[in-house]
C-alpha cells in the first residue's frame, strides 16, 4: 500500500510539472502573437484555467498577458484580481518592460473604473521606465492617456503638454 501511494505521488508530481511547462510554453506563444493577433491571443488565454497555474512567475505572466489581450481587443479590464499580483511580482523580479506593461495595464483598469487619480499614478509609474524600454508607441499611448486624464481633472495646461508629447512620440511610429 505504501508503495502504491509513493507511485501515485510521483505520477501526480510528474503530471503537474508537465502541465506547468505546457502553460508556460503556451504563454510564450501567446506573447509572440498578442500584438498582431490579439483576438487569437485572448482565445488562447481563455483556454487556460487560471486556478491550474501554480508558479508565481507563470501566474504573473498570465495575468499581464490576459490584461493586455483584453485591452488590445477593446474589452474593459474591470478587476485587478489577476493584474495586481502581476504588478507586485514584476516589481520584484520582472524586466523593465514587464514593469512598464503591468503599471500600464493597471492604469487602464483604473481608468475604466473612473478612478482617475489612481490611473494617473499608475501611468506615471509606468513612464518611469520610458527611457529603458525604448518603445515610442507605448510611451506615446501612455502620454496620450495621461494627457486625457489631466484634461478630465481640469488640469488643462499639463494635459496639453502631455498630449503634445504623445503626438511627438506617436509621429515616429509606423
What would you call each of these model-derived segments?
Residues 2, 6-8, 17-174:
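A "functional boundary" signal
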